[in-house]
Amino acid sequence: MKKLILDRGVKIYAHLEENGNHYVIPPVAQPKAFAGNVFLWALDEEEDTCSLFQTTGGYRVRHGRAGIEILFDADYSTAVQEGVPSCDFLGNAFCVRVDGSDHLERAMANFYWKSLLNQCAERSFLRNKKWLREGYVLSTLETTFYGGTYPAVDHEFHIRGRLAMGDAFDLQLVRRMLELQLRLMRTDWRRQFRIPCSLQPNGRREYRVYRKSQDKKVKAVMFLLTGVMELVEELYQYYCLTKDIGFVTKHLGALERGLCFAERFLDQNGRLWGDVYYEDQVMKDGANAQAQAFAVHSFRLMARLETIAGVNEKANHYAKLANRMQHNYIQPVPGGYWSEQDSHYVDWIDRQGVVHDHIHLLSNALSVTFGLNDPARNDAVNAVIEQYDDVFQKFPSFVAAKIEDYTESEIGVGGPYDLCAAGRYWCHDAKYRREKADAALLKRQLERVAQQAGADNFDMGERYDMNYIYYNTGEDSRRNWHGSPSYYEYPNVFLDVLVHDFLGIRPDEEADLLIAPCCTIGTEVSMESFGVAYQLSEQGISIQNISNMPKKVRVDLSKIFTGWEERYGASNSIYTLSPAQSLQFEGLFLRTEAQSERKSSLL
């Protein structure tokens, strides 16, 4: 037995392996005494160091007045490094340099260790609820009032952040989160395979959550279809990263039944009456444009999942539904969502036929990202977003351009809660910017959030109103955020935008990874969890396999080099790299440089 005593202020991140699954016992809601095995991390913020203790056996941790006592069953080794470690929980290192600066890497590390790991409640906050705890993650670390887990809306971004890390621990957590949602669907007491808005620590589920408007004249149901639409993409992305076809086929039937429930809200014209999708204090009582855009995307991905599983008849069914909804979306109001007069998509159309339009960011941006428009319509949408981008980008990213025009019938009793910037809007705004190859703006967004996070000690709030229209008087004006403190959203979305959009390391249906950067010249990245590294310079790009096994990568450099698709195409860009092998593209036409000869080589 080996004893170690640490100061009381040190934060312990303990590891527990059970039945081949990795779990973290994080500092938040950590029990006074518990057991772990194999390794543990000790973060000393006062000394600005982090220690990794590794052992061949188990250990016990006890918090006492004199300090933190750790009893190891066997010998242990110690490795100490400065600051918050630039690695995931299992020790896979990552390195991000942009123009020689590690600013974004430091933000990534701090978000991961101070927020994402603390959100894992399976063996901490929910440790005694064995029937409930698997896949349970917290949306706020202030659990006194909001200790639930939120499958509708929140799990989407929890999963995006963890897929961006790509390590075995985070992927296992994603799997357990998916299994939790599927289990809730199968045990829906109405047998409608619904995903609840929330699951509380006592096991209570919230399905139909209604909000009333400030003037008490309107009410709307929250997140009616959000959970199941999100689950389709979550399962698809999980498959693309793991290639676990067995997991897909096992759960595809439950997902089909969940989508059957969603289809009930589709009318004969292909319009989805989806009510509120993301904004739970905006009274979208009817046909919600962004909900329908997400539904088109999800039904397309469901068609892909059915094709992967070899069920072509059902794949055709979902593809046809997606096409119907797309056709409806692009029609002029009142039949569709396009305003011929203003040349943009409206926000929602209520059940009385009233059109609500405040130049909603996602109602327009999603139409470009998801390919709903023809080129002329894309130009019109791009023009209106550019016209109001000074509002959208006050902080990444504001929900709408005209938030001051929302009425008391449109705003919920909780106040103008969602009429500001939020991570969920930024997530999809970033994908729109990626589609437009706007690497410079993606960089500015990441830097802006990292700057604010640093000012907040990486303990970010739920919404950032920036004292713009609302919350700018009295006590509310003393801070630029409101809602829940220590919130999950911006940390997870930051990782998603940095890794998936800016750096362009993403899951791929056929290859192990897609390398499709939308970054600026002078970007270098290395991620051991994915086994890849690349360097982008004015001379070109070099991509290397840094793992110990062959890796198949699809390469798409169309967002940083012009003429890429004409030269290489979408189907001829998959390369198999042996360990330590590099793939180089030199002399390419950078979007900021003059045209030059193109060539590629494997080294």
Regions found by a protein language model. Give the residues of each.
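Acidic/polar, glycine-enriched structural segments that form the non-catalytic walls/loops
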Residues: 4-13, 17-149, 237-240, 245-247, ...
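Gly/Pro-rich turn-and-neighbor structural signature
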Residues: 111-112, 319-338
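Long, charge-rich low-complexity segments
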Residues: 208-217, 284, 413-416, 538-553
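Non-catalytic C-terminal accessory modules of carbohydrate-active enzymes
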Residues: 4-12, 18, 428-603
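Active-site core of glycosidic bond-cleaving carbohydrate-active enzymes
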Residues: 151-157, 161-182, 249, 253-260, ...
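Glycine- and aromatic-rich loop/turn segments at beta-sheet edges
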Residues: 121-147, 185-216, 264-283, 330-352, ...
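Substrate-binding groove/exosite segments of carbohydrate-active enzymes
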Residues: 90-248, 358-372, 409-434, 443
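Short alpha-helical functional segments enriched in proximate histidine and acidic residues
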Residues: 238, 262, 305, 325-332
